[in-house]
Amino acid sequence: VRTFIDSADKLKVLNARHVMARPSCMMRLSDGANYGLNEMRRRGFSSIYVVGDHMQLEGLITLESIIRALKENISLKDIMIRDIPRVTTETIISDILPIAAEAKYPIAVVNGEGELEGIVTKAMVLSSMI
């Protein structure tokens, strides 16, 4: 068994569930811009994930955008980035690698119902290869 495990290609065996971290910075649109800004400050993040009432991933809002929304009284819906990289919990690392190489933000990990389960950063993907 040890020989098999040592010889297995980690990139084709490990999936997002194995390397992801639980998302710690998230909000609902109904929480408002001040809440989002305070969460980012409190947790030390420059972006925040937006989820629906049942944790479905809606998108992401950056620190710069939320500050602009507050200054210019812009709706969070108008500044939310909807087209963000996402994978499922079962996506293997070899399929995540090219996404991570191009991603500006951590990759969202969703389950079969589209609910946010975790995030995967470039560092997490690279460290899984070691």
How should each PLM-predicted stretch be described?
Residues 3-7, 37, 62-65:
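Short low-complexity stretches enriched in small and charged residues
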Residues 26-46, 50-54, 67-70, 85-113, ...:
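The conserved cystathionine-beta-synthase
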Residues 1-22, 130:
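C-terminal boundary and immediately downstream tail of ABC-type ATPase nucleotide-binding domains
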Residues 3-6, 21, 68, 72, ...:
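Phosphate-coordinating loops and pocket residues in cytosolic domains that bind phosphorylated ligands
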